[in-house]
């Protein structure tokens, strides 16, 4: 194993049984036909699975849409490129001459792809548990930060609105079904959320009373936050 690959292994905290896999993972398509694109494809799928698994365990109250948004934040190209920079993957990339001259080793897309390829290489070399351990280590700080920031956002809109009002000693909101339309099996509910005499009532719409109330609460909270921003200008 070359000195460069040794340094990268130390950064990763993982030693390859087959160093050729790591070399393959850092070889860009501009350098040779035998490049990291297939490993990138594999690593992308494994990374998405592992992050989904971490989030599923860490956010037991989160709904599917919320989990998807959290995962998207953790696997987007900018995040992967940041991780690649922390590992100094760019220093070891094997690039074609043109890509090297144009600074490809700094390019977000190339770094993100190489990071995914490294994940794929670790999977082929050491299996899923080796990958899980590596991803857990690399993402530890981000997962902890995300957990702290996301706990409030994972609360349902009615809870967030109630807590916002209580913190300011405002009256609690009142929800009233103002209209129901559609057939019995396909009804649409309209709910009116009344805050107090200072703010106008807000209308929410949903396929159930609960969803309409949540929609109304979301709109009411947005109104309150916008009003608060205007007062602070």
Swiss-Prot record:
InterPro entries: dsRBD_dom, RNase_III, RNase_III_dom, RNase_III_sf. It catalyses: Endonucleolytic cleavage to 5'-phosphomonoester. One of its GO terms (biological process) is tRNA processing. Belongs to the ribonuclease III family. Its cofactor is Mg(2+). Residues 5-127 form the RNase III domain. The active site is at 44, 116. Keywords: Cytoplasm, Endonuclease, Hydrolase, Magnesium, Metal-binding, mRNA processing, Nuclease, RNA-binding, rRNA processing, rRNA-binding, tRNA processing. Digests double-stranded RNA. Involved in the processing of primary rRNA transcript to yield the immediate precursors to the large and small rRNAs (23S and 16S). Processes some mRNAs, and tRNAs when they are encoded in the rRNA operon. Processes pre-crRNA and tracrRNA of type II CRISPR loci if present in the organism. Residues 156-226 form the DRBM domain. GO terms for cellular component: cytoplasm. It comes from the Bacteria. This is Ribonuclease 3.
């Amino acid at each position: 194993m070359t000195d460069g690959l040794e340094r990268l292994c130390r950064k990763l905290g993982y030693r390859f049984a087959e160093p050729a896999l790591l070399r393959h993972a850092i070889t860009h398509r501009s350098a040779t036909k035998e490049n990291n694109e297939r490993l990138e494809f594999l690593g992308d799928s494994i990374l998405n699975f592992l992050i989904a698994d971490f989030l599923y365990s860490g956010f037991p109250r989160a709904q599917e849409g919320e989990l998807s948004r959290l995962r998207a934040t953790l696997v987007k190209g900018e995040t992967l490129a940041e991780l690649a920079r922390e590992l100094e993957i760019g220093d070891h990339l094997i690039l074609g001459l043109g890509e090297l001259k144009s600074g490809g080793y700094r390019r977000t897309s190339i770094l993100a792809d190489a990071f995914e390829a490294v994940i794929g290489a670790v999977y082929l070399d050491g299996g899923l548990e080796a990958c899980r351990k590596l991803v857990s280590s690399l993402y530890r700080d981000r997962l902890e930060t995300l957990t702290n920031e996301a706990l409030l956002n994972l609360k349902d809109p009615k809870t967030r609105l109630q807590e916002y009002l209580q913190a300011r000693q405002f009256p609690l909101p009142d929800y009233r079904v103002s209209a129901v339309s559609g057939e019995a099996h396909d009804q649409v509910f309209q709910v009116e959320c009344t805050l107090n005499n200072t703010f106008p009532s807000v209308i929410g719409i949903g396929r159930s009373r609960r969803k309409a109330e949540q929609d109304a609460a979301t709109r009411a909270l947005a109104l309150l936050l916008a009003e608060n921003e205007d007062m602070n200008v």
